[in-house]
Amino acid sequence: MLAVRSLQHLSTVVLITAYGLVLVWYTVFGASPLHRCIYAVRPTGTNNDTALVWMKMNQTLLFLGAPTHPPNGGWRNHAHISYANLIAGRVVPFQVPPDATNRRIMNVHEAVNCLETLWYTRVRLVVVGWFLYLAFVALHQRRCMFGVVSPAHKMVAPATYLLNYAGRIVSSVFLQYPYTKITRLLCELSVQRQNLVQLFETDPVTFLYHRPAIGVIVGCELIVRFVAVGLIVGTAFISRGACAITYPLFLTITTWCFVSTIGLTELYCILRRGPAPKNADKAAAPGRSKGLSGVCGRCCSIILSGIAMRLCYIAVVAGVVLVALHYEQEIQRRLFDV
């Protein structure tokens, strides 16, 4: 089960999710139908040596093309939407228009669907980065619970492992017998981990030399994190090419705001060293609850943080899948149909 316990990691996940939703909204609903495609045009009557000019659909000009004869013998993926607004050249009643109208009649030689480029580059990179960051969060939480962590106050007690609690509930309710093997195993693991953390903080180089597997695990965790953040930040640096003329200014501003905020948040999380907690004896409450109320409180907290969170994740994933399946045809129609 994945539960984002760190507020810093949760903020990054929320920012990446919001960034992806903004891109999906613009791709599906926000783009004007006249600003979806760009065309490589040349004014009618000019020589074939004249350089092609990329422009978006302009209602003051007449675009001539050949929608029934795809370029290079076949359509590009979803390129038919770009040729839908063109006029077939053979229906124009004159072969060579007057000089006064030459500059208002354009021959289209190529068309590009810019929403297709946005959908298959930026949106995909954001989705991959989102899953990679969740993978990093899962690896980091497992390392905090079972692995070597420095500083030591970041460690999470292995006894809080959900499988341990579930095993005790099943054994006590159904088997009517206390099951403590997992608890004893986790206690032994906690003691051994304390010793490893002390050795690591004393001499990290020698520790990693004699235990390279731990270094590989930590390295994989860091690589996954940097790759995820790199993919998200890299979406702002993808060359837009000629499609830049179709993207509005607010999309550029929104992209840089999200990317810079995510990058600065991750940089702050890496550089920030949280203060060590106060002494447990001083921080402990003088009147710690005991008896039935304490047991019920601990059980309720474990249930809410474990089973309830699992149900929430299942509900969210199921909701996303149902919405995607329900609106799949509508999204495809808005993206790639006329």
Curated annotation (Swiss-Prot):
Alphabetical GO CC annotations of the entry are:
host cell endosome membrane; host cell Golgi membrane; host cell plasma membrane; membrane
Where in or outside the cell is it found? Host cell membrane; Host endosome membrane; Host Golgi apparatus membrane
Hey, which stretches end up on the Extracellular side? 31-121, 234-243, 323-338
Gene Ontology BP annotations: fusion of viral membrane with host outer nuclear membrane; symbiont-mediated induction of syncytium formation
Keyword Glycoprotein belongs to the record: yes
What are the boundaries of the region Interaction with UL20? 265-301
User: Pfam families annotated for this entry?
Assistant: Fusion_gly_K (PF01621)
* Signal peptide residues on this chain, from the entry's feature table: 1-30
What are the entry keywords? Glycoprotein, Host cell membrane, Host endosome, Host Golgi apparatus, Host membrane, Membrane, Signal, Syncytium formation induced by viral infection, Transmembrane, Transmembrane helix, Viral primary envelope fusion with host outer nuclear membrane, Viral release from host cell
Lineage: superkingdom: Viruses
Q: Which residues cross the membrane?
A: 122-140, 213-233, 244-264, 302-322
Specify where it is mainly localized: host cell
Post-translational note: N-glycosylated.
- List all topological domains (Cytoplasmic): 141-212, 265-301
Annotated region described as Involved in fusion, given as residue ranges: 31-121
How the protein sits in the membrane?
Multi-pass membrane protein
| Glycan-carrying positions | 48, 58
Q: Subunit composition?
A: Interacts (via UL20 interaction region) with protein UL20 (via N-terminus); this interaction probably plays a role in the coordinate transport of protein UL20 and gK to the trans-Golgi network (TGN), and is required for the cell surface expression of gK.
State the family named in the UniProt similarity comment for this chain.
Answer: Belongs to the alphaherpesvirinae glycoprotein K family.
Q: What does this gene product do?
A: Glycoprotein that probably modulates membrane fusion events during secondary envelopment of cytoplasmic capsids that bud into specific trans-Golgi network (TGN)-derived membranes. Also plays a role, together with gB, in virus-induced cell-to-cell fusion (syncytia formation). Seems to block fusion of virions with infected-cell membranes.
Name this protein carries in UniProt:
Envelope glycoprotein K
Identify the species of origin. Human herpesvirus 1 (strain KOS) (HHV-1)
Organism ancestry: Viruses, Duplodnaviria, Heunggongvirae, Peploviricota, Herviviricetes
Q: Which gene encodes it?
A: gK
